[in-house]
Amino acid sequence: MSRILFIGAHPDDVELGCGGTISKFSDLGYNISVLIIAEGTSGRFDEKDKDTKKVATHIQNRKQNCTNSLKILGVNNIKFCDLPCGNLNIVPLLKINKLIEDEIRSFKPEIIFTHSSVDTNKDHRIVFESTKIATRPSAF
């Protein structure tokens, strides 16, 4: 069975950007995995509020909504890495690369979808760059 990996920066990126594609490949019987790099919420709050229960609850809700949406589309393998939203530029690129490389080694996808290199969101561009690095021929 063919395997497809979708890599998104935040919860909702994959289902909003590729929902139709996911649904089609799922209906065709492909094995689909989704990797979400950042938690998708903390960047929306002031620095003083980032470690509050409100933020933690918001993160959990976003993850649950993402999981529910992806299950409707036929995805059962979803991994959240929980890196800081809106701040992937302060995370060592090597760490993001490793998360993606580990998922590729584990899942062994034949096709990978991710963000565009010209996306306006900086987290999206960083995930694109890390995906490009993680999929270089010398990586495997």
Predicted segments, located by residue:
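Active-site rim/loop-helix segments in enzyme catalytic domains that contact anionic ligands
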Residues: 1-107, 133-137
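Histidine-centered divalent metal-coordination motifs
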Residues: 10, 115, 121
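Short, well-ordered beta-to-alpha junction loops that form the rim of enzyme active sites
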Residues: 82-84, 114-117
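Short glycine-rich, flexible loops that bind phosphorylated cofactors or substrates
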Residues: 87, 120-121
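Short, Asp-centered acidic motifs that coordinate Mg2+ and/or phosphate
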Residues: 111
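Short Gly/Thr/Asp-enriched flexible loops that form oxyanion-binding sites at enzyme active sites
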Residues: 121-135
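Active-site cores that bind ATP or allylic diphosphates and position pyrophosphate for catalysis
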Residues: 140
